[in-house]
Amino acid sequence: MYKHMLLPTDGSKLSEKAIMHGVALAKALKAKITAVTVSPPYSAIGSDAVIEMDASQRAVQYLDAVRKAAAAAKVDCDAIHLKDDLPYRAIIAAAKKQHCDLIVMASHGRRGISAMVLGSVTARVIAHGALPVLVCR
């Protein structure tokens, strides 16, 4: 069925829950996973350089958590850190580039005004992508 799953993570508790579901599903299906985290691109000078270093350190932590969960389940795992102003676009592009056949991700479940103002990365991945998406809450 599914052979290669993309697991986007933002380090949130909901994202960690989705990772656990994704790793368990990958183990059951004997599938490979690719973890991805996306941070905005920053300028290489000034205070942006400090922000970028912090974002890079967080990305390493997020991806290491996925690697650790995958290793514990004996699931093959790659991990990539992407930089893009639009996380949904980077997630869709990563899934295509890595030849994934399923995306497993969290939804924060925002409703009403906050959903309209903040938007939803998950909703945009579903709307703009071509792959099936397993949404975890």
Feature annotation, model-predicted:
Residues K3-A49, A69-D78:
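Small/aliphatic-rich secondary-structure junction motif
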Residues L14, P87, R111-I113:
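Short glycine-rich, flexible loops that bind phosphorylated cofactors or substrates
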Residues A18, I45-D48, R89-I92, A115-V117:
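Short, well-ordered secondary-structure micro-motifs
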Residues G22, V66, I91, V125:
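Aromatic/hydrophobic pocket-lining residues that form π-stacking "cages" and hydrophobic walls in ligand
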Residues A24, K96-R137:
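Gly/Ser-rich helix-loop-strand patches that form or flank binding pockets
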Residues V36, I80-L82, C136:
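Structural motif
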Residues V36-A65, A93:
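Acidic, proline/glycine-rich short linear motifs
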Residues A71-I103:
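Structural beta-alpha unit
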